[in-house]
Each structure stands twice: as structure tokens, then as C-alpha cells.
Amino acid sequence: MSSKINKFILGYWSTKGLGSASRQMIIYAGIPLVAKIYKVLPKEENGEIIYEGSSWHDNDKINLKNKNSLINLPYLQFIKDNKEFVISHSNTCLTFLGKELGMFGENMHEELECEQLLQESVDLRNIVTKFAYTHFHSEEDELQAAKEVFTSAFENSNSGKLQKFEHWLDTKDNNLLKTFLVGNNISAPDFNLFDTLDLYKKFLFHYNFVKDAKDENIFELAGFPLVSDFFNNFIQLPKLQKYINSELYKLPFTNKGAKFGSGKSGITWDPAIDTDTTPEEIIIE
């Protein structure tokens, strides 16, 4: 019989980013997590401030590359059946954790649903992430790009990404809960969609795309009541509260070089006033 994993090491930058959903899954499952944190640091180059990742590239990456030539952030490191494993790439981590922790469907049909929904949530995230890491020549250009993100994600038509999830929840079998995307149980795409929606919530508020909204109704006012219920139910799940109350949930959504979602004192990281005090390891048991 295969042994259970009694601890995960998950390495990622000092942001939520592509490591957040995997962190959540481990904590939700009640398995001890050692979150290894790597920081990008500012340096001046040709009169401009850029950010370099030597804390990762010149340190742990060198040793881990001997164990996995494909190593990148995020990575998972664990012992199973007396053998060490190091795996990389965000979707691989999510899929592995889903299957290992019983969060990837109850049968082949549900597993295929998990695969599709996970990819769809990645597509939804990529729209706003590309925007977040783009530095625009003017405020006018930024606002125009923000409107395009809003249209791509929130247009309530066949081309809008979020309407796919609304329709998915709407057409679920009436005998199944709408609390989760697949069946009656939590699965990997739930975590990735929640994390992506959390970023979009910040985006909607910052650019004031939904008037007179509050945390609990912003997606409903945007035209997605079932997605709104999903988000509100998910963030209140009892097993998720250890993550919600941890330092990991307080991390910025994007890394310091991003224009949107990276700041501590504002929407953009400002090296003149912001300080990254995240510890090198965050242990949650």
C-alpha cells in the first residue's frame, strides 16, 4: 500500500501568484506545509529599477536542478514510499495535489471535468496577469487595456470567460451542490478559480468597473450571481480559514515588477516605501 505524505515543501516567490492555489490545497488537507519564500530584489540598470531573482536562481535552484532538470517556481518537494520527489510547474503541482489529496473527482467523468475546469481557470487568470505585468506609456493606455480585460473576462456572452463558469454552475445536475465546480466535493479547480476571482475582485474595485459594490456582492452586480455565491461560500470554508488567517493570504497577488497587484502601500510596488518582510519560510501545521 502506498504511504501518505506527511509534509510538503512548496517553493515560490513572496507573492500569491501561481503558488497560491497549491498552498491552499495543502493547508486545506491538513498536511504540514513548509512554504519556502524567494524574493526578487531591486537593482538599478540603465537608470531604471529592475528586479532580479538571485535568491532563487543562485541558491536552491542549483541543487534542485540536480533532482529535476525542469525545476522552476513553484515546485513541490516531498517524500513518498521512502523516495524523494521534486516536481515543478503550477498545473502539474495542482493536478498532482488534487489526485494525491482526493481533490480531483470521484470517477473518470469528474476527473475529466477537473482537467477542463483547471485549464479554463488558468485561461481566466492569464487575461488579468498579462495586464498586471504590462507597463503602459500613459494612464490612458492603461485604462484602455483595463477595459479590454474587463470585456474579455466579464462580457456576458459566448466570448466572455467568466460566463463559462456561471453557465457551468447553472447547468450542474440539480442533485449536486453548486458550492463546488465538480460533483459534491472540493477539487483543484475550485482553489484556482477562487484565487483568480480574488485577484479580479481587486481589479474590479481599483478600476471601479462595478458601481456601489461591496466585497460580498461585486461579482453578483457584475452579472454573475452563481460565481458570486461560489466565491462567498469558498472563502468561508472552515478548513480554509487557517490559510485565510495566515501570512500567505496577506502576500501581494503579483511580483514586484508588476504594475498591478504588487504593492503593499498601493496597487504597485514602490521600492522607496515598500519593504518585503516576508520570512524565508512560513510553516503551517
Model-derived segments and their meaning:
Residues 109, 116-236:
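GST-like fold's C-terminal all-alpha helical module
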